[in-house]
Curated annotation (Swiss-Prot):
Its main location: membrane. The chain crosses the membrane at residues 14-34, 39-59, 70-90, 93-113, 115-135, 155-175, 213-233, 252-272, 284-304. Part of the ABC transporter complex LsrABCD involved in autoinducer 2 (AI-2) import. Probably responsible for the translocation of the substrate across the membrane. Keywords: Cell inner membrane, Cell membrane, Membrane, Transmembrane, Transmembrane helix, Transport. Coiled coil: none annotated. NCBIfam families: PRK15432.1. It is a multi-pass membrane protein. The keyword Transferase does not apply. This is Autoinducer 2 import system permease protein LsrC.
């Protein structure tokens, strides 16, 4: 049972999402509707994109805490270009390139300069946030064109164009990691770095690619953010890095690298977003959101740690069972046989 849970964390995350959807339905029947699903999905798109990028980095046994700042910086660039008269496609491409470049820089710091990921990205967190504030002068960017907002308008089955793009990206990333040698290189790099090198995996390049794609996903999240609310505050992206990491952990992505799946991270992002909608339904003040999300994450981390210890103990028992089995006892001869011998 323990091994099944460990190897199928996506199923447990899915069950948690379903329970969080069904249980509030007993309080309000209107909550059990397609409209609720589309609303939660629309709210979860930013976190889903960030969780997908964070998954790639965490699979390589690294962590990136700068994605919130990358999201804010890229959203600011998008707003500045649009207000300067550039077309939406040009502004979006430039925004994605900036995110890719920011992620690439993180990857270079970690893979080539050998700076620990948490230290490197803590530094770039402040760097990218500072660039964002220098560009805006601490002011909000408003007056964004209506065509940007159309990206988040319902298009088909109540899902926007960006929503469908996110679904396509999830499917593509799941296929890439599960079915291709390139995708399996991320797992190999995080599971055993030296072993992956001996197998011919270019581990430095894989880590740089992971950070670069993570930055690109953060840039796309910035585009989604700007299109959904129609303006860009000076604190855009603050705290999103922690939510992205939490979503991955909730979905079964190991902090030790080498295990997990994209679909688990997506379900973790959905779960965290759905908590907010349930709190609204229960009329709980919004300032409880982070507390409850943190409490849930802490519970999952404790459960994950205890589960890992139990599995390791069970594995050791199986490994040494044949050495611990006592030899069969020798039965004494019966008294009748003794008399015959006499």
């Amino acid at each position: 049972m323990l091994k099944f849970i460990q190897n199928n964390r996506e199923i447990t995350a899915l069950l948690a999402v379903l329970l969080l959807f069904v249980l509030p339905g007993f309080l309000d029947r209107q909550y059990l509707s397609v409209q609720t699903l589309t609303m939660v999905y629309s709210s979860a798109q930013i976190l889903i994109l960030l969780a997908m990028g964070a998954t790639l980095v965490m699979l390589t046994r690294n962590i990136d805490v700068s994605v919130g700042s990358i999201t804010g910086m890229c959203a600011v660039l998008l707003g500045m270009l649009l207000n300067a008269g550039y077309s939406l496609p040009v502004a979006c491409v430039a925004t994605l390139l900036l995110g890719l470049l920011a992620g690439f820089f993180n990857g270079v710091l970690v893979a080539w300069l050998k700076i620990p990921a948490i230290v490197a990205t803590l530094g770039t967190l402040g760097l990218y946030r500072g660039i964002m504030l220098l560009w805006t002068g601490g002011k909000w960017i408003e007056g964004l064109p209506a065509e940007l907002k159309q990206l988040s308008a319902p298009l088909l089955l109540g899902v926007s164009a960006i929503g469908w793009l996110t679904i396509i990206l999830v499917a593509f990333m799941a296929w890439l990691l599960a079915k291709t040698a390139f995708g399996r290189s991320f797992y190999a790099t995080g599971d055993n770095l030296q072993g992956a090198r001996q197998l011919g995996v270019r581990t430095e390049a894989i880590r740089i690619v992971a950070f670069s794609l993570n930055g690109c996903m953060a840039a796309l999240a910035g585009i989604v953010f700007a299109s959904q609310i129609g303006f860009i505050p000076n604190q855009t992206g603050t705290g999103l890095e922690m939510k992205a990491i939490a979503a991955c952990v909730l979905g079964g992505i190991s902090l030790l690298g080498g295990s997990g799946a994209i679909i688990g991270a997506v379900l973790g992002a959905w779960f965290l977003t759905q908590i907010d909608s349930v709190l609204v339904l229960l009329r709980i003040p919004a300032w409880w959101n982070d507390f409850i999300a943190g409490l849930v994450l802490l519970a999952v981390l404790v459960f994950d740690g205890r589960l890992r210890c139990a599995l390791e103990l069970n594995l050791r028992r199986q490994k040494y069972a044949r050495f611990m089995t006592p030899p069969p006892s020798v039965k004494p001869a019966s008294s009748g046989k003794k008399r015959e011998a006499a």
